[in-house]
Amino acid sequence: MELSFFTTFEIGWLNGWIPSFAMLLVQIIFMMLFPQGGKRAVDTSWYTPRDRRYALLSSAAQAAVLIVSIFAPFKFGTAWFTVGTVVYLIAFVLFIWSFFSYKAGKPGETIQGGIYRYSRNPMYFFFMLGMLGVCIATASLWLLIVMVPFAVFTHGIILGEERYCEATYGEGYRKYKARTPRYFLIV
């Protein structure tokens, strides 16, 4: 079984959109249940023009990923599906944990508890990992192709956020940054 390019582009009810939109739904539910934490998470008042461009490009790329996932059927009964499902489920659980860890953080302080002990950007990382799981479970090269710019533009957002955190939280954030990888156990 190999990654499929043209053969997987078909609309269906049992396609990659189900887990893809579930990841988006988690974000929406968090914003509704915890409006203060949600407000803090989406505050872009400090964005530079470059950060705004990255945010716009990342949002457009995320929309493309979600749209392409509608046309990417799962490869049920294959190793692709099994491995992709396991990757997705692990990422989904850790993605949810990252929201609860974020909520537990105190306003005005660097969030360092929960899963933030292992990653400075767990929401981004586990969203990407979950979407990679969907790519694997569908064996869709189309989906993988649109994931690449999404990951690149999101990385640009992360770099901007880290500059902001360093300027805002100073030495405390620099110490946190020195001991905690940007992406779960890497970098």
Q: Residues of each region from the PLM?
A:
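Histidine-centered phosphotransfer motif of kinases
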Residues: 117-125
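Membrane-anchoring alpha-helices and their flanking helix-loop junctions
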Residues: 1-113, 125-187
